[in-house]
Amino acid sequence: ITDADISARGPKAWDDMLNTINICKFNIGSGATGIVTHSFYESLNHAAHRNVYGKYVTDFPHVKRLFLDSFCRLAAMKLFGLRATDYMRAASAEDKRYLLYNPIMKMKVAIQGEEVHEMLWDIIAAKGFEKDNYFSQAVVELRGFPKLEGTRHVNMALIAKLLPNFFFNPKEYPEIPRMNGPENDDYLFQQGPTRGYGKIQFHDYNIAYNSVDLPNVNVFKEQINAFVEWLMLSGMELKDQMLGDFDFLLAVGEIFTLVAYGQLIIESAAIEEIDEELLNQIFDVFVRDFSRYALD
């Protein structure tokens, strides 16, 4: 290796490496979304043409529920990805909110993809093992996505550092529009030093949640309020608990992640003009997820 082959040395080399990961990890969520979308329609096509006991598989109540939840989770994955893209492209030295949303895109969206795939597999059963369909290969590839660039525990420990500022120290920012034009993405190639991660501030999550009045979103808001109250009562002891027990950190981090996840989905739904019935049903799934994480 010659000097001509080395692009950076010292602290800059370290910063460039981590900043490259900040961007590349985003593609893990995008890849999972694409894989699951293909598997969803392949599974639906199979089930809609398979007749069992005089009924098509898609007519069974439990299959309807599995397809409904799968569709809602997949729609949420896509909506989050669209909005997270906006924050990544709008990033600057003064606005580094993407450093929360990109890890969520990598970890949360990829794991959601696994959950959707498991539900689809419950529908198509043995068909998922056959080598002449897409699903069998998707199973192999999708399982590895959440493990790329660190385990979920590592990513959650990183995200948890942002919890205090997210809930208790919001900052006003100009509203970020849809960023799907030919804007110059030069900041993504010059992100600067990687220090100061825990000092990043975010816009008030209540702005998004208060912009809609839907039954399941309102229940979800009650859950958020209960979580915030618990955080306030826990105080500084919470940090010590999370550092000493990674399973506890994972459960707390999952709830925090779900709040930010839902926030961007509401923002994205408004931009994409998503039907309120679909948004309400997505939060039906989230209310159940929130309860499960709280029990953990």
Question: How should these model regions be labeled?
Answer:
Residues 1-296:
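Flavin-dependent oxidoreductase catalytic core characteristic
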